[in-house]
Amino acid sequence: MADGVIARLMSGGRGARSFYEELRGRDNVSDVDDRAGLLDEENLNQHFNDYDLENAEGLRLEDSRATVDGRIPRGRAQLSGRPPRPAATTHWGTSHDDDGDNDVPASLLVERYDRGAAPLGSPGKPRSQHAGSRAHPAPGLSKGRTHQQRPHIDQELQPPLHSDAAPSSLLAGAITGNAKKMAEWRWANITNLDSFMQDVYSYYRGSGMWCIVVERVLHLIKVAFVAFLLTFLSQCVDFKKIPSNQKLSQVLVPQCTRNMSGLWNIGLWLFAFYFMWKSIQYILDLRRLTHVRDFYIHLLNIPDEDMQTITWQEVVARIMVLRDQNVRTTRTITPQNQRWVLGSQSKERLDASDIANRLMRRENYMIAMINKDILDLTIPLPILRNRQLLSQTLEWTLMFSILDFVFDPKGQVHQEFLRSDRRGILSAKLRSRFIFAGVMILILSPFVAGYLIIVYFLEYYNEIQKNPSILSARSYTPLAEWKFREFNELPHLFKRRLDMSHPFASHYIDQFPKAKTSMVAKTVSFIAGSIATVLALISVFDPEMFLGFEITHDRTVLFYTAVFGAIWSVARGSVSEDNAVFDPEYALGNVVEYTHYQPEHWKDRWHSADVKAEFEELYKLKLVIFIEEILSILTTPFVLFFSLPKSADQIIDFFREFTIHVDGLGYVCYFAEFDFKKGSKSQAPAATAGEGDVRDDYYSTKHGKMEASMYGFINNYARNPKHLPPAMRQQFHLPPVFPGITSPTLAGDLAASRMGRSQRGRSKGPLPSRTPRPGAVMAEPSPMASILLDPRHQPIFPNNMSFVNTGHQFRGGNQGDGHMMGGGSMEEDVKGAARHGQQTHDDESEDSRAGLDESAWQVSPTKDLSRENSGRGLDSVVGEEAGNGAGVVHMLYQFNQAHLNRRLGGVR
C-alpha cells in the first residue's frame, strides 16, 4: 500500500501502471530461478503444464479418462504458448461423491517405519471430488470420512486454491470437530511458513495469549490517559487562578473542549483515529492468537501456564518432533507450484537454524550492511560531518526504505534485485524512497518529538526525583546494538547477552582514573551536602519554617533542600571508589566475551584512552541517548536527503551479491548460512595475491562476525549447559561407545546408507568412512553437536582447522592476548584449506548439497516416487532397502525416536 502511494506521488498522478505493480507482476510471471537453473526439471519424474492444475484429476496415476467437451481457459492457453488440448474429465460430470476415499494413497506416502500401520485408502480405486475440495478439507466438514482418526498429519504441498475448504468460523469448528483436529488441519495447510513462525515466536515472547491481550489493553489505556491528561492540563485548567483559589472547580475552564485551538483539535482527531484503528486491529487479531494458542497447546503440548517459563530451545525441539511426525505427500501439481513449495515453503526445513533464518531473514541483511559499512549514516552538517548517528527514528526509515522495498509480501527477495541489468532503475527508486521518507519525517517531526518528550518525562520523573544517580546510568546505543548483533540471533537471546555484559561495561568505564573530575566532584558534593544538612537540621527544630520560609522569591527551604540533595547525589556518583582496582583487561575482556565485538586495533590496547573513548561512543549515558534521539528527528531528514542516496548503488549491489537460494527455505543472506567452505571456494581462483585479498575482504565479514555468529548460535542451541559458569563448562565431550543420534559421524554414515546406487555411481569422491585415510581431510565429531540441528547444520571441523586456535576461550582459561578473538579466524583457516585441498573440498561440497529428503531422519527417503514405484506399497520399498542392508538404519531410526520422546517428555 505504501509502495503504491509513493509510486503515484512520484509519477505525478498519471494513470500508468506503477513501478511496484510491475515489480510484483514480474515476480508472479517469471522466476529467475528458472533461468539460473536452480531447479532440475529432469528429476521431477513427469512434466506438467500450467493448465494441468485445473484438470488435475485427469493426471491421477491410477485413472486416466478423456472428456468429450473439455476446455481450458483461453488466457491460460495463451500463456503456456501451446495449442489447447482436450482436458481430462471434470468432477462436475460424475454421478457419485465418494468423500470417504478422498485421501492420498498409501503408495504415495513416505512416512515412519511402521509395519503394523493400515494402508490409507485404496490406490487402485478411482476417486472423485468436488471442485472446492482440492485443498485439505477442514475436519468435520465432510460426512462419512473414516480417515480423520489417523495419527499423522498430511503436509500440504500447494497453497489452498479455494477458500471454501477452510472452516467458516471457530464455532463451526468447535461443533464439527475438536480443537486438536482443527489445529492439525491448520498446521497441514500452512501456506506461508515465515509468517507462521513469526506468529509462533511473537506468541512466545509475549508469554502466552492472555499476557498479550493484557499488554495490548494496558497500552490503549496508557495512550488514552496521556491524551486525556495533556488535554485537561493544557485546555481545561486556568493556571492563573490557582494562587487565588482553593478548589479545583474554581480553576476549571467551562466548556473547554469548544474553545480548543485548531492544532489541538487535529491532534485529538489523530489520537481518536489511532485508538480506534488499534482497537479494531487487536479485536480482529484475537482469532490469530487463538489459532497460535491451539498450536502450542494441542500440537506442542505447551499449556499457557508454562509460556512464561519454557525456553525457546524447548519450543524448537517440539516443533522438530512435530515435523518428524509429519508425512510427506506428493500430489499431481504443476511444476510452478512444486517450485513454490520446494523453493521456500518446505516444512522439512524447520530445525533451529532454518527457523532462525526465517525469523531473521530481513534482519540478517541489516546486520551485514552495518558490519560491512554499506550504509552512509554520517550527518551532513559542518560540525557533525564525521559523526555517525543511528537512532530509532532513522532505523524505522531504513526498514521502510530498504527492506520493505527489497522483500515482497511473502518475505522473499524480489527477483528484480538479482538481475544486474536492473541496477540503475532500482537505485533510482531507492533514492526516491529515501527522499520520500525524509519528507514524511519533516512533516511528523513536531508531533513525534513532543510525544517522546512528554512520555519520557511522565515515565521517569518520579524515578529521577527519588534516585538522581540513575542519570549516570549507561546503555548501548542503537548503532552499537546492530554492531554487536549476530546472524540468526533472535532478539530475546541478543538481549540476554547484552544484559550480561552491562555490569562489566560499567565497571570498565568507572575504573579509569579521573583525578581532576574526582577532585571537583568531591568539592561540589561537600558544599552541596553541607547546605542540605544545615537546611535539614533547621527544619527539625522548626517544621513550620521548613514549609513556609522563603530563601528567595517563592522558593522555600523545602525546594532548596531537594535541589542541593540532588546535586550531592550526582556529584557523589562521579567520585571514584577508594578501593577500586584498575584492571581494564579483566573488565573489557568480559565485555568482549559477551558482546563478541573487538576491532583489530583494540588488541593489546584495552588500557589506552583511545579504546576507552571508542567504547564510550558505543556505551553512552541514557540521558545522552535520549537527547540524541530527540535531535535525530531533526537530523534524520538530512541523512535521508544527502548521505544515504550516495549508498543506493552499493545497497543494490549488496543484495545481488550476497543473496543465495536455499532449497526449501528461499532467499537468505549469504552470511546467515555460515558456509565458510563455499565462500573460500568462490574466492580461491584469484588472478593475483592482491586481487585475492580484495575479494576476500569483500566476500567476508569484519571483526570475525560470521565466525562469532556461528559459535554464538551453536552455544545457544548446543547441549553444553549455559547455566553453569564458563570455567565449569565441559570443553570437550568424549564420544560414546555407540555413536549418538546427533553425532556428525553417524550423520555421514546415515547419509551414505541412504544414497542410491545411481548417486553412488556419480559420486566424485570416496564414500564417507569411519576409518580416516592418511592425508585426507576427515570431518571430526564436534563437541558442540546439537539435537536441535539437522545433520547438514551440525558443526564439523576439518583436521586443519583447530577450534582452539580461533581464540574463543572461556574466562576460566588463559586470559592473555587471545582472550576472545585471538589467532586466525575460521574464515581464514577455511580459505587456506580450500587452496591446499580443492579436490577434497569439492567432495565435501557435493555431499553438503543434499536434497530435501535428508533434512529429517526418514526410513526410506532414497526411493523417489515415480510412476514406476508409486504403485508399490511402503512395505515393499522398505523390504527392498532391508534386503540391501538398511536394517541398521531402521534400528537407528527407532533409537532416535525413543531418544527424542524421552528427552522431550513423551511429546509426539
Curated annotation (Swiss-Prot):
Segments passing through the bilayer: 217-237, 260-280, 526-546, 556-576
Keyword annotations: Autophagy, Cytoplasmic vesicle, Endoplasmic reticulum, Glycoprotein, Golgi apparatus, Lipid transport, Membrane, Phosphoprotein, Transmembrane, Transmembrane helix, Transport
BP GO annotations: lipid transport; mitophagy; piecemeal microautophagy of the nucleus; protein localization to phagophore assembly site; reticulophagy
Biased composition (Gly residues): 813-825
Membrane topology term: Multi-pass membrane protein
PTM summary: Phosphorylated by apg-1. Apg-1 phosphorylation is required for preautophagosome elongation.
Family: Belongs to the ATG9 family.
Official protein name in the record: Autophagy-related protein 9
UniProt organism field: Neurospora crassa (strain ATCC 24698 / 74-OR23-1A / CBS 708.71 / DSM 1257 / FGSC 987)
